[in-house]
């Protein structure tokens, strides 16, 4: 592509991103990723949901907390399908269902770490036609003990 005025600067991109409506951009971006998925004929994708604190986003001088995002990553397309900002890591539980609402999960395996091991999240994935792989930790005592029991039964058989 020929750019008569030269390549846009970092500042130009920053100004554009600052005026974009985040929610509308996100909807358009997710629709675009779904079109790519269809054109690549990816039918059984794995979607990895994970929260990350953005490096360098903490600003102590301005009393600004670090930015935390919950991201959905497609292993089949090797790209992010969408993300939701959260106030803190503890808010991932409320952000994950919002992110799942935006995604097409039909025939997908959705993997989430232990913070996503919630009945509401598992139900949402299955209602949307997907399957889930959730990590279980000891802080969910009943579920953890049942998992150990089932694992022992499978090992003995």
Regions found by a protein language model. Name each.
Residues 16, 57, 81, 120-121:
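Active-site-proximal flexible loops/turns
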């Amino acid at each position: 592509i020929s750019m008569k005025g030269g390549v846009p600067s970092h500042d130009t991109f920053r100004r554009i991103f600052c005026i974009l409506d985040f929610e509308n951009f996100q909807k358009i971006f997710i629709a675009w990723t779904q079109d790519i998925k269809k054109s690549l004929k990816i039918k059984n994708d794995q979607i990895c949901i994970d929260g990350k604190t953005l490096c360098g986003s903490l600003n102590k001088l301005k009393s600004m907390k670090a930015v935390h995002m919950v991201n959905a990553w497609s292993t089949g397309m090797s790209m992010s399908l969408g993300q939701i900002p959260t106030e803190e890591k503890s808010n991932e539980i409320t952000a994950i269902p919002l992110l799942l609402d935006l995604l097409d999960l039909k025939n997908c395996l959705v993997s989430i770490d232990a913070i996503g091991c919630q009945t509401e999240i598992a139900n949402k994935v299955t209602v949307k036609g997907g399957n889930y792989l959730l990590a279980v930790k000891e802080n969910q005592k009943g579920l953890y003990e049942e998992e150990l029991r089932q694992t022992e039964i499978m090992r003995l058989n």
